[in-house]
């Protein structure tokens, strides 16, 4: 293999992992605290403290929903987005908030 061939092969491998070159990137985009971005979540509430309370309340509802499934009681609403495998209730709640799937009045 000549130098130019090895350089071309290396460039092809690098392009495969470069999202700006149309590749998927080295890693999938993680869900949860880093995705959706905090800045976009803060656009939906008045402060970071309101976001914490809002997300925590919804995560608690999702957790209670999963706990009640075995009892046959359907008092709580389940996730409004498709949960990922082993995805935590807080991550689900943040994705619901980001998707504007919930209505929230601050102070409640």
Curated annotation (Swiss-Prot):
Keywords, comma-separated and alphabetical: DNA-directed RNA polymerase, Nucleotidyltransferase, Transcription, Transferase
Family: Belongs to the RNA polymerase subunit omega family.
GO molecular function: DNA binding; DNA-directed RNA polymerase activity
Name this polypeptide is given: DNA-directed RNA polymerase subunit omega
Function in brief: Promotes RNA polymerase assembly. Latches the N- and C-terminal regions of the beta' subunit thereby facilitating its interaction with the beta and alpha subunits.
InterPro entries: DNA-dir_RNA_pol_omega (IPR003716), Pol_omega/Rpo6/RPB6 (IPR006110), RPB6/omega-like_sf (IPR036161)
A GO CC annotation given for this chain: DNA-directed RNA polymerase complex
Reactions catalysed according to its record: RNA(n) + a ribonucleoside 5'-triphosphate = RNA(n+1) + diphosphate
Subunit (UniProt): The RNAP catalytic core consists of 2 alpha, 1 beta, 1 beta' and 1 omega subunit. When a sigma factor is associated with the core the holoenzyme is formed, which can initiate transcription.
GO BP annotations listed: DNA-templated transcription
Keyword Membrane carried by entry: no
EC class (word): transferase
Gene3D superfamilies documented for this protein: 3.90.940.10
EC number annotated for this UniProt entry: 2.7.7.6
């Amino acid at each position: 293999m000549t130098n130019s061939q090895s350089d071309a092969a290396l460039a092809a491998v690098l392009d495969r992992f470069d999202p700006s070159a149309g590749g998927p990137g080295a890693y999938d985009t993680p869900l949860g605290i880093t995705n959706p971005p905090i800045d976009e979540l803060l656009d939906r509430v008045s402060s970071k403290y309101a976001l914490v309370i809002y997300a925590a309340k919804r995560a608690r509802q999702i957790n209670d929903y999963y706990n009640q499934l075995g009892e046959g009681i359907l008092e709580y609403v389940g996730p409004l987005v498709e949960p990922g495998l082993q995805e935590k209730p807080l991550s689900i709640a943040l994705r619901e908030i980001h998707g504007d799937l919930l209505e929230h009045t601050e102070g409640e």
